[in-house]
């Protein structure tokens, strides 16, 4: 594909200047995509840019999130995190894990992604979705017009499922493990109050809703979790195993529904991702 949106390496925002630069480049790219030409700039503006680095700059102030800056919220959410990190409800997982993987992102996010359980990379780093599947998830999030830090990402199971000694890889969480750990996720959702949630893979769907069904049977239509609309879609690991454009398009169609539900703008280029016109 010539316009594959999920193959670009993600550059982390290091400071406020980089954040502003990334946002500016994103806006300029959208202008080009929507109008079919590069935006123009006057020679006077270019001269100003040449001398801009000589002036003292102040860090950009991020726009406050709804509910951010509430000391009580921050204290209680931090308390939930600490309690989760200390959990030993599954003794076998408490013994085998490197650390509990609580979740990451904006605790006031309007969009929340839920996976099944940490893998080896996540267990080592203490953050969900940081391996190859996580890198693909980040690209999907960015193709939607978000930054990874704008959304919230968590798993049904907070500990990596244990493996027999000498055996590599990851295993699926058991129903009992997910049932035991689910209250932690439910409390996270209660705090975050996302407008929309996305479950990634059949195991996450089972762990959150108790639905033992194939994702192919339910994807593309809205489900419900205590009044929060849920879109079930394939796990990014599935897309790594199955590189068919048709499968990528299915996931992207699910994400387009999410964007529409959130009232987010969708460019014509975004609507064409993984279609014949983009091949």
Residue spans for each PLM region:
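Cationic, low-complexity basic patches in intrinsically disordered or flexible, solvent-exposed regions
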Residues: 5
């Amino acid at each position: 594909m010539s316009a594959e949106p999920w193959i670009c390496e993600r550059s982390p925002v290091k400071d406020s200047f980089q954040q502003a630069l990334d946002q500016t480049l994103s806006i300029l790219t959208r202008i080009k995509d929507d109008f079919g030409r590069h935006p123009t700039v006057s020679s006077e503006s270019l001269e100003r840019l040449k001398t801009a680095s000589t002036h003292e700059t102040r860090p950009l102030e991020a726009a406050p999130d709804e509910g951010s800056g509430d000391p009580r919220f921050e204290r209680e959410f931090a308390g939930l995190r600490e309690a989760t990190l200390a959990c030993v409800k599954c003794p076998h997982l408490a013994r085998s894990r490197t650390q509990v993987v609580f979740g990451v992102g904006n605790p006031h996010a309007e969009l929340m992604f839920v996976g099944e359980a940490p893998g080896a990379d996540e267990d080592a780093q203490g953050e969900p979705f940081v391996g190859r599947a996580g890198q693909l998830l980040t690209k999907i999030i960015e193709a939607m017009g978000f930054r990874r830090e704008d959304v919230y990402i968590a798993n049904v199971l907070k500990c990596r499922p244990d493996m027999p000694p000498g055996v590599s890889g990851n295993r699926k969480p058991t129903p009992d493990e997910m049932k035991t750990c689910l209250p932690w996720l439910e409390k996270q959702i209660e705090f975050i109050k996302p407008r929309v949630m996305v479950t990634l893979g059949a195991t996450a769907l089972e762990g959150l809703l108790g639905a033992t069904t194939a994702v192919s049977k339910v994807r593309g239509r809205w489900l419900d979790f205590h009044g929060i609309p849920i879109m079930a879609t394939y796990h990014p690991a599935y897309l790594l195993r199955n590189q068919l454009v048709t499968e990528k398009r299915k996931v992207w169609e699910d994400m387009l529904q999410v964007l529409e539900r959130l009232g987010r703008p969708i460019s014509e280029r975004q609507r064409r991702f993984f279609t014949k016109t983009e091949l």
